[in-house]
Each structure stands twice: as C-alpha cells, then as structure tokens.
C-alpha cells in the first residue's frame, strides 16, 4: 500500500484459492465469496466504486482475467499478469468499458500462456477498447510485476457508459443476473 500513492483505490488480487478441487477462481463457492467481498467493500464509507481494480499473477492472472470479464461492470481497470485464458473463458466483449492490461513473458510457454495472450491481443486489436496486451521479450514466467498497477491507476470506472457489450457466459454453470444496467428477466430453456 505504501508503494502507490493512489488512495482511495482498492485492488483485488486473486491468488490460488486454498479450497476446492483444482483451486480455481471460477468455481461457484469462490464466486459467492468474491461477490460478498465486493458488496461489503462497496458498503464501506471509504469506498470509491469507481476506483476498484483487479489484477493477479500466474494462477491469479488466470483468475483476474476471468473475473475481469465476468464482473467487467465493477472494475475501473483489470491487469492479469503471467496468465492467459482461452477467450471462451474470458470474452473480450465484456471489456468494452474496462481498460485491460495483460502482460506475459514471450518465453512463457507453460499452459500455452504466451499463445493465449497473443490470441487475446489479436482479438482486442479488432476493437476500439482501451487495452495494453504485451508479450515481454526475453521473459518467461517471471516478469516485471511493477508495470501493471501504475497503468491501472490511470483509469476510473465509468458508471454510465453510452454503449455496453455483454457476452453472458457461465462460470461453473452459473450466469450473472445482470450486467451494468441490464437485467436478465428470463433465460431460455437450454435442455
């Protein structure tokens, strides 16, 4: 906290959850815990709902990329590092109003992180969204993590965007009830 002079910003930094098979952030129990944490923070007197950020490293990079897309309407900006999710798990469409930074080492081939980061960059290049996606030359899984938060802190959430894109994707069989100012009144029967 002493490193950054951007109060009253709040950063949510997912790491490997300590419960559940495979320790993943997309599991329902983690979603419920995360939503409760967000609600409690938003009720605090010091909360600035337009200065809420998410970033993570490695497993936290996967988690923060999925959470960035699933809860894009909450974040001022998002910054996964040393991660890289398949786009079906973290659709870029939801990032229209959420500045997004993804930094991965160009030599980080574990779990195809460098390839998945390149796919994310190629998809975002087709948009006019605010983003920074880079494969850092000469780096493997351990990159310079200090580059992300100063970039994120430049941005504040726009609570009333003129345009919204929302791919209503599921995480662990669960969908959001709404997104931004949209609400789902009825879902089609998919059985």
Q: Where are the regions that the model predicts?
A:
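Alpha/beta-hydrolase-fold serine-hydrolase catalytic core, especially in secreted/extracellular enzymes
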Residues: 125-191
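Surface-exposed acidic, glycine-flexible loop patches that form ligand/cofactor-binding
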Residues: 2-4, 41-48, 88-94
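Sec-exported extracytoplasmic/periplasmic mature domains
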Residues: 6, 39-46, 69-73, 125-129, ...
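Active-site machinery of serine-nucleophile hydrolases
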Residues: 1-43
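Primarily recognizes the serine-hydrolase "nucleophile elbow" in alpha/beta-hydrolase
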Residues: 50-96
């Amino acid at each position: 906290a002493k490193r950054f002079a951007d109060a009253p910003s709040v950063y949510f930094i997912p790491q490997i959850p300590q419960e559940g098979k495979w320790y993943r952030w997309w599991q329902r129990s983690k979603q419920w815990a995360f939503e409760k944490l967000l609600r409690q923070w938003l009720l605090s007197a010091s909360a600035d709902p337009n200065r809420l950020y998410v970033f993570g490293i490695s497993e936290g990079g996967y988690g923060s990329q999925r959470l960035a897309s699933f809860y894009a309407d909450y974040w001022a900006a998002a910054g996964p590092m040393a991660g890289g999710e398949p786009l079906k798990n973290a659709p870029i469409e939801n990032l229209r109003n959420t500045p997004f930074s993804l930094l991965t080492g160009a030599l980080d081939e574990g779990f195809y992180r460098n390839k998945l980061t390149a796919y994310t960059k190629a998809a975002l290049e087709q948009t006019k969204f605010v983003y920074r996606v880079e494969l850092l030359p000469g780096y493997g899984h351990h990159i310079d993590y200090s580059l992300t938060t100063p970039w994120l802190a430049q941005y504040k959430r726009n609570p009333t965007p003129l345009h919204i894109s929302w791919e209503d994707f599921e995480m662990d069989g669960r969908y959001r009830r709404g997104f931004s100012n949209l609400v789902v009144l009825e879902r089609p029967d998919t059985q």
